[in-house]
A protein has these predicted regions:
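Intrinsically disordered, low-complexity, positively charged segments
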Residues: 1-52
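Conserved short beta-strand edge segments in small beta-sheet-based binding/regulatory domains
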Residues: 67, 135-144
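Short acidic/polar mixed-charge low-complexity motifs
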Residues: 40-44, 66, 76
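Short proline/glycine- and acidic-rich turn/helix-capping motifs at secondary-structure junctions
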Residues: 76, 114-120, 141-155
Length: 170
C-alpha cells in the first residue's frame, strides 16, 4: 500500500499524469488519515500532517513520487432555492442570504452556487430550510463546500518572507 503525505493543488499539478483516481465523498476528502482504493485498484494510505479538505482535481503525492487524482463523489444533498416570487431578484437575493445566514449560524457546511445553496442531506436541516420557505430539491451531486474563516489553507505553499514588526521612535 502506497502512502500519500502531501496534497498537490490542481493549479500546481498542471497536466502531470496520475497513477490512479480516488473518488471520495466530503467526509473522506476532509479526513486527515484514510485508506482508500483507486479506480485502477491501487490501495492507498493517506496520512496528512494536518486535516486538509481535498477538492476535485487536487492530487496526492505518493512516496514513490507518483500522483493520485482526487475527484468528489456524488452524495445525497439538499439544494435550496429562495422561495420568493419569480422575477423579484432583490427579494430572491435577500431570501438566499437569509437561508445562508441560518445555515452558517449553525456551522453547517454549504456550497454556494448561483441562485441556490447545497448542503448535505440531513432531516433537521431539511426541516429548517422548509420552515424558512426555501424551495428544496433532493439531489445526488459532488459536494464542494465553501472553506470558512477557520479552515486551514495548507497545500504546502512556501511563504518566504518575514512578518517582522518595526517600531517608530516618537
Amino acid at each position: 500500500m502506497l502512502r500519500a503525505t502531501r496534497v498537490i493543488s490542481a493549479a500546481e499539478r498542471g497536466n502531470r499524469p496520475v497513477a490512479d483516481t480516488l473518488i471520495l465523498n466530503y467526509a473522506q476528502r476532509s479526513a486527515q488519515v484514510l485508506t482508500a482504493t483507486g479506480l485502477k485498484g491501487g490501495h492507498f494510505e493517506i496520512a496528512l500532517a494536518q486535516a486538509t479538505r481535498l477538492r476535485t482535481d487536487d492530487a496526492l503525492l505518493l512516496e514513490d513520487g507518483s500522483l493520485v487524482e482526487v475527484v468528489a463523489a456524488p452524495e445525497p444533498l439538499i439544494e435550496a432555492r429562495a422561495g420568493d416570487v419569480a422575477g423579484n431578484v432583490a427579494g430572491n437575493i435577500a431570501s438566499l442570504a437569509r437561508l445562508a445566514w441560518h445555515l452558517g449560524d449553525r456551522h453547517i457546511a454549504v456550497q454556494m452556487l448561483p441562485n441556490r445553496i447545497r448542503t448535505r442531506r440531513e432531516p433537521g436541516v431539511e426541516n429548517l430550510l422548509k420552515s424558512l420557505g426555501a424551495k428544496l430539491a433532493l439531489i445526488e451531486a459532488p459536494f464542494e463546500p465553501e472553506g470558512g474563516a477557520y479552515e486551514s489553507h495548507a497545500h504546502d505553499y512556501d511563504h518566504d518572507h518575514a512578518h517582522g514588526h518595526h517600531h517608530h521612535d516618537h
